[in-house]
Regions:
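Peripheral, non-AAA+ core regions of ATP-driven protein-machinery
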Residues: 5-239, 243-246, 351, 493, ...
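The Walker A (P-loop) glycine that initiates the GxxxxGKT/S ATP-binding motif of P-loop NTPases
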Residues: 242, 305, 327
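Walker B catalytic acidic pair
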Residues: 326-327, 338
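P-loop NTPase nucleotide-binding/switch module
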Residues: 196-230, 234, 265-315
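Walker A/P-loop
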Residues: 240-279
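Basic, amphipathic alpha-helical bundle interface domains used for macromolecular binding and assembly
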Residues: 59, 65-70, 85, 92-102, ...
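Short loop/turn elements that form and flank the Walker-type P-loop nucleotide-binding site
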Residues: 84-87, 124-125, 155, 175, ...
Length: 533
């Protein structure tokens, strides 16, 4: 499928009349992009070479990396056989109120300078969008964000000039799109002269050589495997509580093996975020869903996003995939609470004094934790070293609103020795993945027929899930009594309906029955409270 998205850039060149100093001033314009989230905003790079005191000035709200471009551009031009004229060189990045970040402004500034000096044909540059970083020897280094820029350039029927290392990434925008991916300024200049023709780079898919861990390798834990299948089928969040060594991490690591591959639209979204973060290895796209497992020492900026340049965090890099948080209570409470908005809205918003940045963050949260700091609270014959309050104090690090967003909460007991000695006889990931794929197709077809954008039951809104998961009379009675007994919030009520709808989809049932609701409520039960008691 051809990737479609946001608009970015165009290129133009315009000579001006004589300046006040009596000499002729030349202004060349090359439009590049500045990134806000995965959106590329057009930036007009205006270069003027005119009379006056010899200087090289960059204005237009540049950050430090952009401000340093003057030295990289100057050295790259000298290495390429050109030198700046002994005149006043002014570079304006418009609009001035849009923050300019990153080193990808080097190449458009250099090309605008070369066009103003007559070293490159300005008319040819009008057909391209330009971005790239320059090394001191005139070579062009890779930069982040080439894929969003290429998609936008294709939307405007423009070509793209980007570093050679990013050519494969840019080629995904459209098979007919004109892309120049030079190694150096000299190679690009020779291409425009006709002495060295650059061939179009070709798109690449990651080979994914690593075999994913198989669910059949997990001994015992049949109830946990069932919960994992439900989570995969409906895109539900899952919390596993159990002692050390019970297999919680082992189960989580096998979730990607039963998830369906990315759809073309999901592949686009995932790849654009990876491109912005500079994590698109060799420009190759992968159909596997992201699986991110940050350490519990991760900061707010690392997990949710932020920093000086408002970069995407782990929750955004896991978009359309899995975010696995092991040892959940060991994360800083304020960091975990920062996940509440992305889990609810599917979007991370980072606000700065002068701009607002958002990243898609529709993730499936899989969390694992011990019941207490000792790890064995609630087990027969075990007494916590820290006393009866060990479990309650440990679990109090998790806020109620965060727990309310976890659709499935299960206990993962210690594996019995008999299960470890018995040969593995469980279902393979391929078998479970087939059932998951059928359930997801039912959801996709149902939501498409209703004309809504949701793809999974977990992503459905409250009104929509009430419509598609309306229980029968017996199920309604059970739900009403359980809502009082479990003190379900409005969010908890709707999440029970979502899980019940997924159970019905796994069974191939059109309607949600009492049995589906009963099982959904069992996963909403007070697993934490039982362990803490």
């Amino acid at each position: 499928a051809r990737l479609q998205s946001i608009a970015v850039a165009a290129v133009s060149h315009k000579p001006l009349g004589r300046g006040e100093g009596g000499g002729q001033s030349m202004v060349s314009r090359v439009t590049t992009v500045a990134f806000q989230g995965i959106e590329a905003k057009p930036v007009d790079v205006q270069v003027q070479i005119g009379p006056g005191q010899v200087a090289f000035t960059i204005v237009g709200l540049p950050d430090k990396a952009v401000g340093e471009s003057r030295e990289r551009v100057r050295s790259a031009l000298i290495a390429s056989g050109l030198s700046l004229p002994a005149k006043r060189v002014t570079v304006n990045l418009a609009p001035a109120d849009l923050p300019k970040e990153g080193s990808h402004f080097d190449l458009p500034i250099a090309l605008a300078l070369m066009a103003a000096m007559g070293a490159l044909p300005a008319a040819e540059l009008e057909r391209y969008v330009v971005l790239g970083e320059l090394a001191l020897d005139g070579t062009i280094s890779p930069v982040a964000g080439v894929l969003p820029a290429a998609i936008g350039a294709n939307t405007l029927a423009r070509g793209l000039i980007c570093p050679a290392a990013c050519g494969a990434e840019a080629a995904w925008a459209d098979p007919e799109m004109e892309i120049l991916a030079p190694v150096s300024l000299i190679q690009l200049a020779n291409h425009f002269k006709g002495t060295q023709i650059l061939s179009r780079p070709q798109p690449k898919l990651s080979a994914n050589p690593l075999v994913l861990p198989d669910l059949a390798e997990v001994r015992g834990q049949e109830s946990a495997k069932r919960a994992l299948e439900i989570a995969a089928a409906g895109g539900h969040n899952l919390l596993m509580i159990g002692p050390p060594g019970a297999g919680k991490s082992m189960l989580a690591m096998r979730l990607p093996s039963i998830l369906p591959p990315l759809s073309p639209r999901e592949l686009l979204e995932v790849s654009m975020i990876a491109s912005i973060a500079g994590e698109l290895a060799d420009g190759k796209l992968s159909e596997r869903r992201p699986f991110r497992a940050p350490h519990h020492s991760a900061s707010m900026a690392a997990l949710v996003g932020g920093g000086i340049r408002a970069r995407p965090g782990e929750v955004s890099l896991a978009h359309n995939g899995v975010l696995f948080l092991d040892e959940l209570p060991e994360f800083q409470p304020q960091v975990l609470d920062g996940l509440r908005q992305p889990l609810e809205s599917g979007e991370t918003v980072i606000v700065r004094a002068n701009h607002r940045t958002s990243y898609p963050s529709r993730v499936q949260l899989i969390a694992a934790m011990n019941p207490c700091r000792c790890g064995h609270a609630g087990e027969p014959g075990h007494v916590c070293r820290r006393g009866e309050r060990c479990a309650s104090e440990y679990q109090s690090r998790l806020s109620g609103p965060l727990l309310d967003r976890l659709d499935l909460r299960i206990e993962v007991p210690a594996v019995a020795a008999s299960d470890l000695l018995r040969p593995a006889q469980g279902e393979s990931s391929a078998t479970v993945a087939e059932r998951v794929a059928r359930a997801r197709r039912r959801q996709s077809e149902r939501f498409a027929a209703l004309g809504v954008a949701a793809r999974t039951n977990a992503a459905a809104g409250a009104r929509l899930i009430e419509q598609v998961a309306a229980p029968d009379a017996a199920g309604l009675d059970l739900l009403q009594s359980a809502a009082d007994a479990l003190h379900l919030s409005a969010r908890g009520y709707h999440r029970v309906l979502k899980v019940a709808r997924t159970l019905a989809d796994l069974d191939g049932a059109e309607a949600v029955s009492r049995l589906h609701l009963a099982e959904a409520l069992s996963y909403r039960g007070a697993a934490l409270e039982r362990r803490a008691a």
